[in-house]
Amino acid sequence: MFDIGFSELALIAVVALVVLGPERLPKAARFAGLWVRRARMQWDSVKQELERELEAEELKRSLQDVQASLREAEGQLRNTQQQVEDGARGLHDQARELHDEVGRDIDIRTSATPLAAPLELQADAPVVLEPGSAQPHTPVPAPAPVVAQAQPMAPAPKQTLVPAPHGSLTSTQVTTHAPTASATASSTSPQEKTP
């Protein structure tokens, strides 16, 4: 502590013996030892307190470093969360646009297709020609009442419009045309006619 060697201690002991004398020297030595012990204890306590303060300061610095890294990580997480939310919002907007586009396409297609079947007439509906028009007028049947349960219906026979020989349109049943006897007779060759 004081860097005092053996020769210096011997010199101090000789000076103390001469100054104090042999009677008071043991009492003075105890007193000096007590003060040296107290000084060492004070020095050790100050040293320990400085070390504790340095450790506390070091802990504070490390705590501040950890807090700074936590803030940085929190900022990165918020940025990542914001990016994910922006991406999700973008995907949601794209999905909504696709849904709207598909809905518009469906609306366009349904408005482009006719609602009634063209040129199909019901079996019991008479065809009426109005004077001065070439189009037949078919009365529109009243809508059928809504039934609580759906019942299967037999399909109605299909009718097509066939021009009559005198130029007006009439309704006839669709049938397969079988060749008539006169048509087959005229189409056979003279060699086949001989029995």
From Swiss-Prot:
InterPro entries: TatA/B/E (IPR003369), TatB (IPR018448)
Subcellular location field: Cell inner membrane
Comp. bias intervals (Low complexity): 145-157, 175-195
A GO molecular-function annotation: protein transmembrane transporter activity
Bilayer topology term: Single-pass membrane protein
Chief site of localization: membrane
Protein's UniProt keywords contain Transmembrane helix: yes
Listed GO biological process terms: protein transport by the Tat complex
Disulfide bonds: none
Pfam family, one: TatA_B_E
GO CC entries: TAT protein transport complex
Membrane-traversing stretches: 1-21
UniProt keyword Transport, yes or no: yes
Tree of life domain: Bacteria
Region (Disordered): 130-195
Similarity remark: Belongs to the TatB family.
PANTHER family: SEC-INDEPENDENT PROTEIN TRANSLOCASE PROTEIN TATA, CHLOROPLASTIC
Protein's job: Part of the twin-arginine translocation (Tat) system that transports large folded proteins containing a characteristic twin-arginine motif in their signal peptide across membranes. Together with TatC, TatB is part of a receptor directly interacting with Tat signal peptides. TatB may form an oligomeric binding site that transiently accommodates folded Tat precursor proteins before their translocation.
Description of how the protein assembles with itself and partners: The Tat system comprises two distinct complexes: a TatABC complex, containing multiple copies of TatA, TatB and TatC subunits, and a separate TatA complex, containing only TatA subunits. Substrates initially bind to the TatABC complex, which probably triggers association of the separate TatA complex to form the active translocon.
HAMAP family assigned: TatB
Record-given protein name: Sec-independent protein translocase protein TatB
Record organism: Xanthomonas campestris pv. campestris (strain ATCC 33913 / DSM 3586 / NCPPB 528 / LMG 568 / P 25)
Lineage, opening ranks: Bacteria, Pseudomonadati, Pseudomonadota, Gammaproteobacteria, Lysobacterales
Gene: tatB
